[in-house]
Amino acid sequence: MLNIYVNGLSGKMGSSILNQVSKIEDILIIESIANCDVVIDFSRPESSLKILNQCLENKIPLVIGTTGFNNDQLQIIKEASKHIPLLLSYNMSKGIYALKKSIKDFLSKNKDMFECIIHEVHHKEKVDSPSGTAIELKEIIENNDKRNFVSSINIESERVSNVNGIHEVRFYNNRDLVTFKHEALSRNIFSDGAIAIAKSIIKKEPNLYTVKDFFN
């Protein structure tokens, strides 16, 4: 039996995780960090850092899906990963992972000049704008455009009702429009990813992991 503590259980993602875990016989959501095997965190940066300290005290692996960290907070997380297995990801869906791989493949073969727009849409309650995933996509493009064929990258953010998450990356010039898009039709895709990672991270050594370490 895998015992999971969820930080942010009363939120949208916490409720989704609770719902998905209820369908799995060998996983239990518990209320005590001291007695859990792994922690999943979907909360706010300040709450994440508090739970991080408790994980450090108890040597418990931590899966963080919270967004909106500043650079100082990210440095604290990085330092903590020297002592416990830790994953920080702004999007744990396998679909977004596939989207990122497709963009990397496109950039590795591209020989044309393009401009780029990243358009992201989320629900109105989402605090950070642009989304962490949109920022990650921008960084992926910057890091994989080895020959500087992408002249500009702009992020457009939109907040509307009843949207789980849409990310669209458009490369365009006066001849072509190349579009990569992922839309989350259910919040459960993020929950399933977080649960799968939680099951695996308990076997890992202390380090700062990414989704790539689990979905390859």
Question: What residue ranges belong to the model's regions?
Answer:
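Conserved strand-to-helix beginnings and helix N-cap segments that scaffold or border functional pockets
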Residues: L52, L74, L99-K100, P130-A134, ...
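Rossmann-fold dinucleotide-binding core
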Residues: I84-S131
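Hydrophobic beta-strand scaffold residues
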Residues: I29, L62-V63, L86-L88
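Rossmann-fold NAD(P)-binding glycine/threonine-rich loop
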Residues: E46, N53, T66-L87, K94-L99, ...
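N-terminal Rossmann-like NAD(P) cofactor-binding module of classical short-chain dehydrogenase/reductase
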Residues: V39-I40
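C-terminal substrate-binding/catalytic lobe of Rossmann-fold NAD(P)-dependent oxidoreductases
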Residues: N3-N7, K12-C36, D112-N216
